């Protein structure tokens, strides 16, 4: 027998999260209840936003809900439904799957500035990183960042610059509206890139990068080594 129902709208905004919950209630009432009066779990899936920084919030056209707001709108609707309808023998557990919501702040991404060029009145910053290291989506937002200058003397004052990756893909852009003082050799730390980053990096141009843990703001500890040539080709049977 079926004891669990799952949906995954990945709604994000609070009004869409409410719609997702109402759709689940409609399914339970009009479809599922015809086949069973037992249900142990209801999962509304994921798609919730993280407790993101103001830099990210300002790039979105709606208010970012808190975790409490997500919980209130879904749990109240589900609870009211079960109290009113009394279709099932026992009230099931309500589950959510906060993947991105928890993982996004787990990682930052550090790149080095290789060159800065000016083309048609716009500065183009080339780096040792790629958007494929953090999120290959064409709809990705500009990440919050911090610049570490090796020297203040040779910095250029960049406004609305493009920060680009090392691949030959025209859309490999890490930041589309970069404003900071910068020079070659500086470091840029892109923050809040833990969601869909490592797992979506293809072995294209360069393999994946190492991961370090910064302990007590003073010590680096390697927790995953960078990929090598051998990692990329070890699965192939070489005919030579």
Regions found by a protein language model. Give the residues of each.
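Active-site loop/helix belt of alpha/beta enzymes
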Residues: 1-112
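Charged (often Lys/Glu-rich) extended helix/loop segments that serve as interaction or gating elements
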Residues: 73, 83-85, 89-240
């Amino acid at each position: 027998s079926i004891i669990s129902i799952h949906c995954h709208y990945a709604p994000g905004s609070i009004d869409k999260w409410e719609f997702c919950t109402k759709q689940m209630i409609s399914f339970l009432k009009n479809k599922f209840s015809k086949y069973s009066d037992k249900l142990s779990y209801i999962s509304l899936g994921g798609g919730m936003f993280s407790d993101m920084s103001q830099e990210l919030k300002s790039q979105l056209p709606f208010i970012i809900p808190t975790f409490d707001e997500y919980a209130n709108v879904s749990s109240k609707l589900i609870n009211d439904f079960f109290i009113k309808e009394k279709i099932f023998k026992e009230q099931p557990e309500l589950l959510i799957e906060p993947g991105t919501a928890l993982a996004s702040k787990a990682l930052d991404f550090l790149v080095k500035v290789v060159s800065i060029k000016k083309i048609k009145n716009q500065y183009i910053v080339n780096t040792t990183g790629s958007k494929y290291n953090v999120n290959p989506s064409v709809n990705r937002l500009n990440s919050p960042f911090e610049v570490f200058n090796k020297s203040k003397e040779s910095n250029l004052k960049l406004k609305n610059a493009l920060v680009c990756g090392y691949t030959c893909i025209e859309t490999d852009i890490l930041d589309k509206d970069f404003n900071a003082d910068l020079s070659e050799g500086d470091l840029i730390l892109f923050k809040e890139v833990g969601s869909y980053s490592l797992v979506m990096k293809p072995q294209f141009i360069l393999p994946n990068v190492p991961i370090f843990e910064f302990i007590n703001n003073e010590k680096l500890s390697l927790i995953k080594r960078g990929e090598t040539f051998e990692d990329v080709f070890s699965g192939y049977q070489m005919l030579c």
